[in-house]
């Protein structure tokens, strides 16, 4: 019934596109008049549009004329005229939606339309790409159009100094990678003045390859971190022990990607740990004193049994480097968290780096939701449309192709074993190679690509391998994959964003030429050669794309298919599968094996059957659904931290903007003074119950006040009067500092101390949240909702953090001291500037431009010791307690508050 209705009325997508086509006529009707304009008149249109916006017009009032202007500018500057379908794509992007356009349909050119229009407001537009190469390429090629029309263009790539970045972000249109944008946002919120920040307020972003960034990378948070402790030796010891375990000692679930020790495994590993003197004899791995070891053992088990070298990671130059499962690219600078990376380093016998503590983090989900207006483009988004709508409130519209797709997608071939599958793939590659038809072979891992490469080497078939190991050559190799007799093996979607042109890409070959020797003649020769090869390739059938396995996501399979048949070119695609493939083995083996038995599969034979294709699609949908729920669950938890992050970042900005820091200082001084007095002199208590001794100690610790016991000797003195006296004494101490150091220095110092203290307690808080997240799922066993428990406890931790902030801030301000012996009074304000400069330089350490920023946060203030989860504290070992709040019960088990027990002398 539904299919009949769709045929009668069309889908919602069809109706949207039809409506957009009617709008395109308005743009086309303006073209004759725009064509008559001189270059100068065309450029002046930008000034005219800005004036209209200033006088109250909206972007929608000028959208058709602005698009017509960009189309004409592109034609004059680049020799490219936007097709009608590209104009539709531009309207979709301008309206804050995602446009799905096939490979080769010119998405890069499409982005110029909404980018130009929205940049007219002067608030900036970010065009987001997945790597530095594409950011540079697109800003250089499309920047010519923007510059012609009088707009400025910036490009952001890794490793740029702040002043260069700031200028690029202040441009009308900025091309940047998603990673750099996210990290610059985090780094900006660790800066100490607004002038040091590089980003402007969020306005409008256009994300290229939007599915890759908002879906594939959604589960990977951006983290700036620093090392916390050195347990390298312990990781090494545990690794050696885990290698001695038997297969019966643990159980693993490949679907859920979990691994656990069995009862026999626990007994076995306990004996091994005891033998190595890591645990005491006759104690259990799960005894309180040994609980921290469980984490090390679990991560070592995962490293050895759930992670494979050259599939999940590779080892390069003595470092373990993560491979992106969707693109096959190395994720430069990223490290697995929670000790997993250290476990992998121990497994591969390379230098074990310190574990890291989070200093700042954000997911792409929450970063991109900061933009008031967001849009994106990709060749494959319809399969993920529900998720994009649910999480980002982005609708997806599929735009028809300019030329009819002539590519032929052949049925899958299923074989009984991997060897039979490879034999069939080799036969097809040989046939295509002999007739000159270019072939692109897609694999799901480096290991598989190198395995296939070795087979082709034995058969003496020339080929190129494109995977994470050759990232630098990625764009060039993929661009030439359409040449006559070319055979290219690519890991997943490596080279995405670069078109495969039949016959080859002449521009990239020309870039390699030496301009000093016969340059023009060589250019002409290359163009003639490419034109000839294009004819030969078209006669041979175009690009043949071979998939060696189905991916977990249908979208990734569609991306691979989409490399062939660009702009109406001929081409073919075909997937070869076997029962040994991961997807078949883990998710669809039982169902498909039954079908194959019914059909009677023989050795070397391939099966083509719609029932198998449907079973595979169901398996993929099941995995996609599972991954979607994981991303959604991550977002639910991350939203808790995101709400807190927004509060902290907003407060930080307010502090930086503040011209008077005394307001917070005075209110906090009064609040803490009252709190301390009432702690030792409770309301309604008898005078003999007042603890004047400890009141004096506490006032000196917090305010540096030397409290005179005679103040309370009067018979009629009240708690309120003593509180007022304490507050006045604190104000007097601060006033004396102003007289000694100058009001300007103290104002700046208070602001600086407040910022550094906020950073310290926030870092500490993130560490506590990390610990909370790691164990919160276990609450489900107690019939409690982990998310509700996480929200409740995270709120409590946040309140505790704010209390710690106040106490540490006040304590530091009132103990703040500059040695004036060798400093003239008129130069004292320079001391603060020097202090501030040192802080800024430590934060701008080159390590901070890396994903894993290293320990570059240092101040002249006493560092705050990290908070430790209470269950990880050893009552007999104060060094294991971390920082303990003064009003907490002492971890030693005495039942006293910490400040009256082990913390009495602090």
Curated annotation (Swiss-Prot):
May bind 1 zinc ion per subunit. Zn(2+) binds at residues 890, 892, 901-902. The keyword Membrane applies. Residues 862-886 are annotated as: Disordered. The keyword Kinase does not apply. One of its GO terms (molecular function) is metal ion binding. One of its GO terms (cellular component) is plasma membrane. One of its GO terms (biological process) is protein targeting. ATP binds at residues 86, 104-108, 499. It holds the Pfam family P-loop_SecA. InterPro entries: Helicase_ATP-bd, P-loop_NTPase, SEC_C_motif, SecA, SecA_CS, SecA_DEAD, SecA_motor_DEAD, SecA_preprotein_X-link_dom. Keywords: ATP-binding, Cell inner membrane, Cell membrane, Cytoplasm, Membrane, Metal-binding, Nucleotide-binding, Protein transport, Translocase, Translocation, Transport, Zinc. Its cofactor is Zn(2+). It comes from the Bacteria. It catalyses: ATP + H2O + cellular proteinSide 1 = ADP + phosphate + cellular proteinSide 2. SMART domains: SecA_DEAD, SecA_PP_bind. Its EC number is 7.4.2.8. Transmembrane segments: none annotated. It is found in: Cell inner membrane; Cytoplasm. It is a peripheral membrane protein. CDD domains: DEXDc_SecA, SF2_C_secA. Belongs to the SecA family. Monomer and homodimer. Part of the essential Sec protein translocation apparatus which comprises SecA, SecYEG and auxiliary proteins SecDF-YajC and YidC. This is Protein translocase subunit SecA. The lineage of its organism: Bacteria, Pseudomonadati, Pseudomonadota, Alphaproteobacteria, Rickettsiales. The gene is secA.
């Amino acid at each position: 019934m539904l299919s009949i209705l769709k045929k009668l009325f069309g889908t919602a997508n069809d109706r949207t596109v039809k409506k957009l086509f009617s709008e395109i006529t308005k743009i086309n009707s303006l073209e004759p008049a725009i064509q008559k304009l001189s270059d100068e008149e065309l450029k002046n249109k930008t000034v005219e549009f800005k004036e209209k916006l200033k006088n109250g017009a909206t972007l929608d009032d000028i959208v058709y004329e602005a698009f017509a202007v960009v189309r004409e500018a592109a034609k004059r500057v680049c020799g490219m005229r936007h097709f009608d379908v590209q104009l539709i794509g531009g309207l979709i992007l301008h309206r804050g939606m995602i446009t799905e356009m096939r490979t080769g349909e010119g998405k890069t050119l499409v982005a110029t339309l909404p980018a130009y229009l929205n940049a007219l407001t002067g608030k900036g537009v970010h065009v987001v790409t997945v790597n530095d190469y594409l950011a540079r390429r697109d800003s250089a090629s499309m920047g010519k159009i923007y510059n012609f029309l009088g707009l400025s263009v910036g490009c952001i790539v890794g490793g740029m100094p702040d002043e260069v970045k700031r200028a690029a972000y202040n441009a009308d249109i900025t091309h940047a990678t998603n990673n750099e944008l996210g990290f610059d946002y985090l780094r900006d919120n660790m800066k100490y003045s607004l002038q040091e920040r590089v980003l402007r307020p969020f306005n409008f972003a256009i994300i290229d390859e939007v599915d890759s960034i908002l879906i594939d990378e959604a589960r990977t948070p951006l983290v700036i971190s620093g090392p916390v402790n050195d347990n390298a030796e312990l990781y090494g010891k545990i690794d050696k022990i885990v290698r001695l375990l038997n297969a019966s000692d643990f159980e693993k679930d490949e679907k859920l990607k979990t691994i656990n020790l069995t009862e026999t495994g626990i007994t076995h590993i306990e004996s091994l740990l005891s033998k190595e003197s890591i645990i005491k004899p006759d104690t259990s791995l799960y005894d309180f004193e040994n609980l921290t070891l469980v984490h090390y053992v679990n991560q070592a088990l995962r490293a050895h049994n759930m992670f494979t070298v050259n599939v999940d990671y590779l080892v390069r130059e003595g470092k373990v480097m993560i491979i992106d499962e969707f693109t096959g690219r190395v994720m430069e600078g990223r490290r697995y968290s929670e000790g997993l990376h250290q476990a992998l380093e121990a497994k591969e016998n390379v230098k074990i780096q310190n574990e890291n503590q989070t200093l700042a983090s954000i997911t792409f989900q929450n970063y991109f939701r900061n933009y008031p207006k967001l849009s994106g483009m990709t060749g494959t988004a319809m399969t993920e449309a529900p998720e994009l709508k649910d999480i980002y409130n982005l609708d997806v519209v599929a735009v028809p192709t300019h030329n009819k797709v002539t590519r032929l997608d052949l049925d899958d071939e299923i074989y009984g074993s991997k060897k039979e599958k490879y034999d069939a793939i080799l036969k097809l590659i040989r046939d295509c190679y002999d007739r000159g038809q270019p072939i692109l072979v897609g694999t799901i891992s480096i290991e598989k690509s190198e395995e296939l490469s070795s087979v082709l080497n034995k058969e003496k078939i020339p080929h190129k391998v494109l995977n994470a190991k050759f990232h630098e050559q990625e764009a060039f190799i993929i661009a030439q994959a359409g040449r006559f007799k070319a055979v290219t093996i690519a890991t997943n979607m490596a080279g995405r964003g670069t078109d495969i042109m039949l016959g080859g890409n002449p521009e990239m070959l020309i870039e390699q030429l030496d301009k000093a020797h016969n340059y023009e003649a060589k250019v002409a020769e290359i163009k003639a050669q490419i034109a000839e090869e294009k004819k030969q390739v078209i006669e041979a059938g175009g690009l043949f794309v071979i998939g060696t396995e189905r991916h977990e996501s249908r979208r990734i399979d569609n991306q691979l298919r989409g490399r062939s048949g660009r702009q109406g070119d001929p081409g073919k695609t075909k997937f070869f599968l076997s029962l040994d493939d991961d997807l078949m083995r883990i998710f669809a083996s039982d169902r498909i094996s039954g079908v194959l038995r019914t059909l009677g599969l023989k050795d070397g034979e391939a099966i083509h059957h719609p029932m198998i294709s449907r079973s595979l699609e169901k398996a993929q949908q099941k995995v996609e659904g599972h991954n979607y729920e994981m991303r959604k669950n991550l977002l639910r938890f991350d939203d808790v931290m995101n709400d807190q992050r927004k509060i902290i970042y907003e407060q930080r900005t307010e502090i930086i903007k503040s011209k008077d820091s005394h307001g917070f200082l005075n209110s906090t001084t009064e609040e803490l003074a009252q709190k301390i007095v009432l702690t030792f002199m409770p309301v309604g208590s008898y005078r003999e119950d007042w603890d004047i001794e400890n009141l004096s100690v506490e006032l000196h610790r917090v305010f540096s006040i030397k409290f005179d016991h005679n103040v309370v000797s009067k018979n009629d003195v009240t708690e309120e009067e003593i509180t007022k006296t304490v507050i006045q004494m604190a104000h007097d101490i601060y006033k004396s500092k102003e007289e000694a150091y100058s009001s300007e220095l103290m104002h700046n110092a208070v602001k600086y101390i407040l910022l550094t203290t906020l950073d310290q307690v926030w870092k500490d808080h993130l560490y506590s949240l990390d610990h909370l997240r790691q164990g919160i799922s276990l609450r489900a066993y107690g019939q409690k909702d982990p998310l509700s428990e996480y929200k409740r406890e995270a709120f409590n931790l946040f309140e505790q953090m704010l209390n710690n902030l106040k106490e540490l801030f006040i304590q530091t301000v009132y103990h703040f001291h500059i040695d004036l012996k060798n400093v003239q009074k008129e130069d004292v304000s320079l001391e603060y500037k020097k202090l501030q400069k040192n802080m800024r330089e430590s934060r701008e350490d080159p390590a901070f431009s890396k994903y894993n920023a290293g320990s570059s946060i240092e101040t002249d203030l006493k560092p705050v010791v990290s908070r430790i989860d209470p269950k990880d504290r050893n009552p007999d070992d104060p060094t294991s307690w971390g920082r303990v709040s003064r009003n907490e019960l002492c971890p030693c088990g005495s039942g006293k508050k910490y400040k009256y027990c082990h913390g009495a002398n602090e």
